[in-house]
């Protein structure tokens, strides 16, 4: 689960990580009022959206008077950035910057550990820095039994700072960020940039946190911060019904039993020139109610023009699946072509049952079924 910058900064503040003065606003008038309350000369007006690239999209502006604050706030609040409408903005004190740094804790799948990543090249896309100047990146795996004790925090801090006073402040921030990362079950805690001001203060002027969805039940406070997209709402509904569902951008809706087969189905669709509309694993049940719910989930996506049902009968018998499909489609009214591939236990019986109903196009092999789906899509697109 992602959270907005202002929410991440609130969490950072509770852990003692220094952030600049800021205020959340929902209107241009509110932004001007907040500007007066803050009593600073210059502010950064930043769109609050759960996606990157807001600066390049014009979602971050600097202002130093009422007119500019109002104008920029109004403009940003009317924007949509990568499909996300901007409904709130963050007014942040624009601090003087002597240097910028990058610091984050994340999960490194290669080392199977929490990893600290630091760089003196802050304020930039860290992945771009890693590609172009990998020598500027410092990576350290963290032993979960030790964490980040004082001696390690100071060792890390002195790799970026020579002066003891600044290194001591950095060491404290490293420890506080690690504590927030662990206690909140985060998969990412990032400050980019962490700035050094001319007077020697360190401030997190941008903040990012991502949390493990599977651990949210332990954090009611974080659950309240969730702002799911429409796709995420559908995925949550599917999860409640026992499905694994992820919406995509294609036109061929997939209903499959088993995650591995679902991945293979999507690969086959791509191989033959199509695009899957979703990942949908309905598990091993042939229950008609489950099929109905899965179909309604697919058909809620208006981009779906063809449905590809791919079932491998292992413990689940194909004739039971066929009966479930027939019962389900007595209640589902749709003109969308339905391609069904049934193979495995009692596969012949299952296919024979479905062929008696002209509602389905039936196949035995995945290749045959995929070609049927692509051909049907071409006809629907004419």
Swiss-Prot record:
Keyword Phosphoprotein appears in the UniProt entry: no
GO biological process, one term: succinyl-CoA metabolic process
Keywords assigned: ATP-binding, Ligase, Magnesium, Metal-binding, Nucleotide-binding, Tricarboxylic acid cycle
Assembly notes: Heterotetramer of two alpha and two beta subunits.
Family, per entry: Belongs to the succinate/malate CoA ligase beta subunit family.
Function: Succinyl-CoA synthetase functions in the citric acid cycle (TCA), coupling the hydrolysis of succinyl-CoA to the synthesis of either ATP or GTP and thus represents the only step of substrate-level phosphorylation in the TCA. The beta subunit provides nucleotide specificity of the enzyme and binds the substrate succinate, while the binding sites for coenzyme A and phosphate are found in the alpha subunit.
Protein name, as recorded: Succinate--CoA ligase [ADP-forming] subunit beta
Organism annotation: Bacteroides fragilis (strain ATCC 25285 / DSM 2151 / CCUG 4856 / JCM 11019 / LMG 10263 / NCTC 9343 / Onslow / VPI 2553 / EN-2)
């Amino acid at each position: 689960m992602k959270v907005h910058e202002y929410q991440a900064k609130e969490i950072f503040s509770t852990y003692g990580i220094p952030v600049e003065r800021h205020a959340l606003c929902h209107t241009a008038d509110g932004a001007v009022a907040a500007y007066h309350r803050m009593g600073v000369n210059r502010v950064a007006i930043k769109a609050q959206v759960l996606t990157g690239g807001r600066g390049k999209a014009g979602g971050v502006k600097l202002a130093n008077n009422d007119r500019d604050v109002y104008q920029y706030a109004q403009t940003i609040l009317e924007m949509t950035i990568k499909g996300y409408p901007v409904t709130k903005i963050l007014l942040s004190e624009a601090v003087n910057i002597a240097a910028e740094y990058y610091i984050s804790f994340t999960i490194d799948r290669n080392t199977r550990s929490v990893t600290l990543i630091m760089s003196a090249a802050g304020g930039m896309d860290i992945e771009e820095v890693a590609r172009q100047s990998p020598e500027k990146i410092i990576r350290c795996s963290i032993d979960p039994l030790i964490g980040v004790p004082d001696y390690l925090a100071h060792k890390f801090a002195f790799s970026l700072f020579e002066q003891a006073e600044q290194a001591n402040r950095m060491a404290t921030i490293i420890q506080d960020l690690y504590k927030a990362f662990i206690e909140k079950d985060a998969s990412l805690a990032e400050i980019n940039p962490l700035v050094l001001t001319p007077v020697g203060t360190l401030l997190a002027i941008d903040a990012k946190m991502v949390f493990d969805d599977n651990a949210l039940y332990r954090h009611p406070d974080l659950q309240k911060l969730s702002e799911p997209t429409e796709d995420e709402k559908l995925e949550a509904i599917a999860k409640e019904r026992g499905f694994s569902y992820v919406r995509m951008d294609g036109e061929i809706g997939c209903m499959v039993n088993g995650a591995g087969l679902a991945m293979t189905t999507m690969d086959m669709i791509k191989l033959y020139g199509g695009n899957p509309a979703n990942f949908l694993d309905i598990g091993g049940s042939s229950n008609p109610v489950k099929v109905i719910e899965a179909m309604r989930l697919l058909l809620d996506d208006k981009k779906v023009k063809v449905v590809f049902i791919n079932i491998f009968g292992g413990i689940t018998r194909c004739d039971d699946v066929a009966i479930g499909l027939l019962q389900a489609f007595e209640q589902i009214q749709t003109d969308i072509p339905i391609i069904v591939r049934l193979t495995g236990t009692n596969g012949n019986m299952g296919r024979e049952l479905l062929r008696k109903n002209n509602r389905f196009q039936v196949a035995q092999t995945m290749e045959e079924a995929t070609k049927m789906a692509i051909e049907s899509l071409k006809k629907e697109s004419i």
